Amino acid sequence: MKEIYEVRMHGRAGQGAKSGSQLLAEAAFKEGKYIQSFPEYGSERRGAPTVAYTKISQTELRSHEPVLHPDAVLVLDFGIMRSIAVAAGLQEQGILIVNTKVCAADIQKLAGFSGPTYSIDATSISLDLLATDTPNVPMLGALIKLTGVVRLESLESVLREHFLPKLGEEKVRKNIEMLHIGYDEVTK
């Protein structure tokens, strides 16, 4: 892994960009890495565009700035790509993962990005298993498969710790299942 691995998640309020960023950071922390995770909001209402940042490093992180040149961008809501330049600053060798059924070539045209681009229908996965549009966990599964930035087992552990007291065993099991489906189904 490079010195600092940076991830930017774009979504809409209520889709889990903030919690996805936190879950990823906590999984990295479990592995002994230094982390930062923080959101940036526009108007704070459900459905408003949001962005969340995660920084993961083997050494102490001293600056607390937005991620301008990410190694990976996750887009939880395909529709925001029409109004937000989600690939802005994305490293040339970075990856773009989008929650959509649209093929990578069409995503690249819309995003203005020619680098590695992947899609996963994370909304359908979350609707099928949880009956809610919270695509963050399947998107994290895709990110882990494509980058290895954290181990799948680390994120499973964080999901258990985070959600068991709040949601119970059944929803934890479904979140872990969504993580694995995201890992298995991401496509180029």
Where is each model-derived feature located?
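Active-site cofactor/cluster-binding pocket
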Residues: 1-188
